[in-house]
């Protein structure tokens, strides 16, 4: 019984090895196609993020200057100090 389980494990290992070797021969063609598309995708992604970064930059002016909250207002830890 132990011999049959060893044979089964060896066959499974051989099958996995063959599967990994055959999948490696398929991927180089596909990875070459993906490499050709990446520069265009990066440019499109950067263009789509730029308006969001510009909006964030405008909103940053609304953050309070005083980061430390002294607890002078009703909302504790709000980040805005009423005394300054």
UniProtKB/Swiss-Prot annotation:
Propeptide: 25-54
Chief subcellular location: secreted
MF (Gene Ontology): hormone activity; transporter regulator activity
Family (UniProt): Belongs to the hepcidin family.
Disulfide bridge partners, by residue number: 66-82, 69-72, 70-78, 73-81
Protein name: Hepcidin
InterPro entries: Hepcidin
Disease: Hemochromatosis 2B: A juvenile form of hemochromatosis, a disorder of iron metabolism with excess deposition of iron in a variety of organs leading to their failure, bronze skin pigmentation, hepatic cirrhosis, arthropathy and diabetes. The most common symptoms of juvenile hemochromatosis at presentation are hypogonadism and cardiomyopathy.
GO cellular component terms given for this protein: extracellular region; extracellular space
Functional note: Liver-produced hormone that constitutes the main circulating regulator of iron absorption and distribution across tissues. Acts by promoting endocytosis and degradation of ferroportin/SLC40A1, leading to the retention of iron in iron-exporting cells and decreased flow of iron into plasma. Controls the major flows of iron into plasma: absorption of dietary iron in the intestine, recycling of iron by macrophages, which phagocytose old erythrocytes and other cells, and mobilization of stored iron from hepatocytes. Has strong antimicrobial activity against E.coli ML35P N.cinerea and weaker against S.epidermidis, S.aureus and group b streptococcus bacteria. Active against the fungus C.albicans. No activity against P.aeruginosa.
Disulfide bond keyword on record: yes
UniProt KW keywords: Antibiotic, Antimicrobial, Cleavage on pair of basic residues, Disease variant, Disulfide bond, Fungicide, Hormone, Secreted, Signal
Organism placement in taxonomy: Eukaryota, Metazoa, Chordata, Craniata, Vertebrata
Gene Ontology biological-process annotations: defense response to bacterium; defense response to fungus; immune response; intracellular iron ion homeostasis; killing of cells of another organism; multicellular organismal-level iron ion homeostasis; negative regulation of intestinal absorption; negative regulation of iron export across plasma membrane
Record localization: Secreted
Secretion signal span: 1-24
Keyword Disulfide bond attached: yes
Record's subunit section: Interacts with SLC40A1; this interaction promotes SLC40A1 rapid ubiquitination.
Sections of the chain in a coiled coil: none
